[in-house]
């Protein structure tokens, strides 16, 4: 009898994607983050769905509805903190996943890479809009500051901001539409994930060496399914520990104060996972220049495949490029720290130096080092 998994139209797709998929035998734990992101998305959609059953997107009741969820709904506090900290886990996995792609040269699969960048923007937009929904002080002022950046766009900027706000300030209309889009976007993200996987399965996975592994493949199941499940357990343990022991560790205390348009918090800042981009934005004195730098800090990933000058795909055998890569990681940590600090000396100059180095390393130092390594190969 023929295996139904190989004949049924739907099961056939699942079988070829998760069971009989040929995978390189040398994949390290850095290849776990794709599946971990899938779990994160699942957790966020499920917890978000149950939160949406009790949340009201009205400026008069939004803050109280979140309080009601935490106090009166059965395990509402758990849902709320799983959702809030699940977003942090999502971004940790996202940044590690992108870092893996940069280190091992996975960006040479340009379609998969570009869909990935699109996914990154979609998840960032979703997270930003989600942060506005509890309608605390940082929700309101964060929304005001970030949406106001669009006014830097020449000619249409002011009209565009008022169109997004649905009025002359962040108010009821803004909150309602942000809730609508925050609900919708994760499903668009899920669809994009399918496209991301479709393109990945066209080429097959990369591996740590960057060398084609067609002659050394193993079935995805049971080898990598077991490996992924171990990853799930580790991540869910970390998430549970964060949620149950210090749920507010990564949040902002100002968000426990209801939104007040007449009272500005002393330091307006986004969630920790946007701080590096926020630091780059603040390091440029010109508004339009800052906005362009902010967008380019992520969009620069799209030109990384063009800047790949090395004869080797992976950085595994390129110690000079490795040094630059880890310097880039250190700079991103520095920018994250600076983004959470007030705009005063010495933080301003540290942020500006780190921002310049961030772009210099990606645009100039890494390609130049790759060319030098190519030359050294001839020795």
Curated annotation (Swiss-Prot):
Reproduce the miscellaneous comment text: Heme 1 (or BL or b562) is low-potential and absorbs at about 562 nm, and heme 2 (or BH or b566) is high-potential and absorbs at about 566 nm.
Main localization is: mitochondrion
Chain sites annotated for binding heme b b566: 97, 196
Subcellular location as annotated: Mitochondrion inner membrane
- List the GO cellular component terms: mitochondrial inner membrane; respiratory chain complex III
| Protein name per UniProt | Cytochrome b
The similarity comment for this entry is: Belongs to the cytochrome b family.
Transmembrane feature ranges: 33-53, 77-98, 113-133, 178-198, 226-246, 288-308, 320-340, 347-367
What is the documented function of this protein?
Answer: Component of the ubiquinol-cytochrome c reductase complex (complex III or cytochrome b-c1 complex) that is part of the mitochondrial respiratory chain. The b-c1 complex mediates electron transfer from ubiquinol to cytochrome c. Contributes to the generation of a proton gradient across the mitochondrial membrane that is then used for ATP synthesis.
Is Electron transport given among the entry's keywords?
Answer: yes
Protein's organism: Ametrida centurio (Small leaf-nosed bat)
**Membrane topology qualifier:** Multi-pass membrane protein
The record's comment on cofactor binding reads: Binds 2 heme b groups non-covalently.
Pfam families in UniProt: Cytochrom_B_C, Cytochrome_B
Q: Which cysteines are joined by disulfide bonds?
A: none
Cofactor dependence: heme b
Query: Alphabetically, which GO biological process terms does the record hold?
Result: mitochondrial electron transport, ubiquinol to cytochrome c
Q: Name one GO molecular function term.
A: ubiquinol-cytochrome-c reductase activity
Q: How does it assemble?
A: The cytochrome bc1 complex contains 11 subunits: 3 respiratory subunits (MT-CYB, CYC1 and UQCRFS1), 2 core proteins (UQCRC1 and UQCRC2) and 6 low-molecular weight proteins (UQCRH/QCR6, UQCRB/QCR7, UQCRQ/QCR8, UQCR10/QCR9, UQCR11/QCR10 and a cleavage product of UQCRFS1). This cytochrome bc1 complex then forms a dimer.
Q: Which residues bind heme b b562?
A: 83, 182
Q: Does the keyword Cell wall biogenesis/degradation apply?
A: no
User: Which residues are involved in binding a ubiquinone?
Assistant: 201
Q: Which UniProt keywords apply?
A: Electron transport, Heme, Iron, Membrane, Metal-binding, Mitochondrion, Mitochondrion inner membrane, Respiratory chain, Transmembrane, Transmembrane helix, Transport, Ubiquinone
């Amino acid at each position: 009898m023929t295996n139904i998994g190989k004949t049924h139209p739907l099961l056939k797709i699942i079988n070829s994607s998760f069971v009989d998929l040929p995978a390189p035998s040398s994949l390290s734990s850095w290849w776990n983050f794709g599946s971990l992101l899938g779990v994160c998305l699942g957790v966020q959609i499920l917890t978000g769905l149950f939160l949406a059953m009790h949340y009201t997107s009205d400026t008069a009741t939004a803050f109280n509805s979140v309080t009601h969820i935490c106090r009166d709904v059965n395990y509402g506090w758990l849902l709320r903190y799983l959702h809030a900290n699940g977003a942090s886990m999502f971004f940790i996995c996202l940044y590690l996943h992108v870092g893996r792609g940069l280190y091992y040269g996975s960006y040479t699969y340009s379609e998969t890479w570009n869909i990935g960048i699109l996914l990154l923007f979609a998840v960032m937009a979703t997270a930003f809009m989600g942060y506005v929904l509890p309608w605390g002080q940082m929700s309101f002022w964060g929304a005001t500051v970030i949406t106001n950046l669009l006014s830097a766009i020449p000619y249409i900027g002011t009209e565009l901001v008022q169109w997004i706000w649905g009025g002359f300030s962040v108010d009821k209309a803004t909150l309602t539409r942000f809730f609508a889009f925050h609900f919708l976007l994760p499903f668009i993200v899920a669809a994009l994930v399918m496209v991301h996987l479709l393109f990945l399965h066209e080429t097959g996975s990369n591996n740590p060496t960057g060398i084609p592994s067609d002659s050394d493949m193993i079935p995805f199941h049971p080898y990598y399914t077991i490996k992924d499940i171990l990853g799930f357990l580790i991540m869910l343990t970390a998430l549970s520990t964060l949620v149950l022991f210090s749920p507010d560790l990564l949040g902002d205390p100002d968000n426990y104060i209801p939104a007040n348009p007449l009272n500005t918090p002393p330091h307006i800042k986004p969630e920790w996972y946007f701080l590096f981009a926020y630091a780059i934005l603040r390091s440029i004195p010109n508004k339009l220049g800052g906005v362009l730098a902010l967008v380019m800090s992520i969009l620069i990933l799209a030109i990384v495949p063009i800047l790949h000058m090395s004869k080797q795909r992976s950085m595994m055998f390129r110690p000079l490029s490795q040094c630059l890569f880890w310097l880039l990681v250190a700079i991103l940590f520095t920018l994250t720290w600076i983004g959470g600090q007030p705009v005063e000396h010495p933080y301003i100059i540290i942020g500006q130096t780190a921002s310049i180095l961030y772009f210099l390393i990606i645009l100039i130092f890494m390609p130049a080092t790759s060319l030098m390594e190519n030359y050294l190969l001839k020795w």
